[in-house]
């Protein structure tokens, strides 16, 4: 296998080609699935109201996310909108927008609503749920989130990245995943998620990235479940799936993407994306 430029990122595992040992067993993640990417978006963010329409380098944030999802080339991309003003912004950028019930309690409920409106015939068997506040997300990470679904034992897939500092490990805002990767493994089962430091003891810690790939039946089952005790305690929706016996597989990627949750985050995104626009 010839050695490409080390700055090029592999479409399948989201690691640089310079680490050749990771790539010799790859097959395209999407060969056996027909994904659709859905981006839930609403105006009512608590910490940064209306952030999905915040201007970044001349475009609403949701449009940056839309363009990066399209760049992945995995399949159709649509925004599941809670309000018409978001739909208008998406359509003005040439995107597909679906108006959903503004009262949905979660992004998972919103994308399931949009899925049934867009694809009532069930053509798409995998649904990628991409957050609308990740304006610099690498399209390669959307390929990476499909990797666990190569194993039929997993119902849901998501991503983790290494925790790289003590500050990150202690941060309540950083969700940690209890998982362990064997030598050479890129996928592992998720055993628990917490805002606290898990697991205890020496060893790697993993920062959960809230991008999910659901098998269609798993998404339907998940949204039909009532909120679970640990979900309510930790305020982490994915624990509902684990408590119900569903299996979540995690793929590891090099670093957590930058998310916009505060005004300071927004200003940083404007500086970074403005520089490259």
Task: Describe the residue ranges of each PLM region.
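Short, high-confidence coil segments that cap the C-terminus of an alpha-helix
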Residues: 74, 122-124, 152-155, 246
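Cysteine-centered motifs
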Residues: 10-13
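Conserved core of the sugar-phosphate nucleotidyltransferase
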Residues: 137-228
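Short phosphate-binding loop-to-helix
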Residues: 78, 85-144
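Short, positively charged and aromatic/hydrophobic N-terminal segments
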Residues: 15-19, 25, 29
């Amino acid at each position: 296998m010839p050695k490409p430029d080390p700055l090029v990122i592999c479409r399948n595992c989201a690691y640089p080609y310079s680490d050749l040992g990771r790539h010799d067993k790859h097959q395209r993640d999407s060969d056996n699935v027909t994904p659709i990417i859905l981006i839930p978006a609403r105006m009512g963010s608590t910490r940064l109201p209306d952030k999905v329409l915040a201007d970044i380098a001349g475009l609403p944030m949701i449009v940056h996310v839309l363009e990066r999802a399209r760049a992945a080339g995995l399949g159709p991309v649509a925004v599941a909108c809670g309000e018409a003003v978001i739909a208008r912004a998406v359509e003005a950028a040439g995107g597909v927008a679906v108006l959903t019930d503004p009262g949905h309690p979660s992004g998972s409920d919103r994308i399931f609503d949009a899925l049934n409106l867009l694809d009532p015939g069930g053509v798409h068997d995998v649904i990628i749920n991409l957050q609308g506040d990740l304006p610099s997300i690498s399209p390669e990470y959307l390929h990476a989130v499909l990797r666990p679904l190569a194993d039929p034992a997993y119902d849901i897939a998501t991503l983790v990245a290494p925790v790289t500092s003590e500050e990150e490990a202690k941060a309540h805002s950083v969700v940690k995943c209890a998982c362990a990767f064997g030598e050479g493994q890129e996928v592992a089962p998720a055993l628990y998620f917490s805002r606290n430091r898990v697991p205890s003891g020496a060893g790697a810690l993993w920062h959960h990235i809230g991008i999910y790939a659901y098998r269609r039946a798993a998404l339907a089952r998940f949204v039909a479940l009532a909120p679970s005790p640990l979900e309510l305690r930790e305020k982490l929706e994915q624990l509902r799936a684990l408590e119900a016996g569903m299996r979540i597989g995690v793929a590891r990627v090099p670093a957590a993407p930058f998310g916009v949750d505060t005004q300071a985050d927004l200003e940083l995104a404007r500086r970074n994306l403005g520089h490259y626009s």
